[in-house]
Amino acid sequence: MKIPQRYLQNRTSNIMQEYATINKSILDKLNPSNLYRFFCLSLYRNDYYKVRWRIKDLARHTGESKDALKNFNKDMEAVLVRKRYSEPINHPVYKFTMRSLYCIPPIEQPNFITISHLFMKVNLSVKVKGYYIKLLLIADNNKIILSSKKLADKLGMGKKNIESYNLDLYNAGLLRFLSNGFELTPKDLLLSNDIAKQRKEWNPTNSKNVVKLVFKSK
């Protein structure tokens, strides 16, 4: 049986939210590139913080090749749960393929930040964007009073990379240097945590979440 393409397309998450939240606890669990990829993934969560995406969907939104994401699912095991499910496909031999359902972790009050979807439009590399998210996670009042060496030690990164990324952020208008560190200038990219909504929990006793079955006696 041929399955309508419209039905197959609806099996992926294609509605982008206005923002994504990032818990401070994941700071040391993901490298900069994966942290930005996690942000992009989170933007397409539903009310239950679930995302149905293929690797090629993620690659399309981050502007990367699929090869660059070959270890993505394994790396994400440090911060989220990935469930596998079968999906029907139009294929002469195989009736279905396996897809991923990503379960985004709930908000950890009060230790999180809220980032606007507009961050995706910033013209910087995936690594630099992920590095900026790390800076937002550790900043105090948007300020980081650390030398490049101390910051590199804190984030587990190379000092030269830190200095290079800082220059990219400065040129993009997202950072300004101070005499003893620097200040982040995210403007409308960093939102108030007050707007963030916690994920909904699946409640099988809620009639809206249950498919009602009626059995008729013969």
Protein language model features and the residues they cover:
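Electropositive, intrinsically flexible nucleic-acid-contacting patches
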Residues: 1-218
